[in-house]
Amino acid sequence: RTGQPIMVLFDLLSRRWAMGILWNLSNGPCSFRELQARCGSASPTVLNTRLKELREVDLVEKTTGGYALSETGRDLFKRLEPLGDWAMKWVPTL
């Protein structure tokens, strides 16, 4: 780790299924099984590990409805969403 906050964030988000979890939770809470179905090929071990990591940094929280984005997670997602829009325009140019 470099100690730079942006690099710490990129390190976390680049881990397998971290972005997929955030993206899938952006539509509302999911149980573990629902999230696993939405993430398709994510193993239960990887999904559990990633959820634990995302909870430890307050991006995801456990609720009565399952897992959900925390307030911090929703704020991050709002900032990432324009990147998704940009990527949709960029991909066809490849």
Question: Which residues does each PLM region occupy?
Answer:
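Amphipathic alpha-helical dimerization/coiled-coil segments
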Residues: 1-5, 23, 78-94
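N-terminal helix-turn-helix DNA-binding core of bacterial DNA-binding proteins
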Residues: 2-46, 52, 57-61, 68-74
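Short, polar/charged, Gly/Pro-enriched helix-capping and turn/loop motifs at alpha-helix termini
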Residues: 49, 61, 90-94
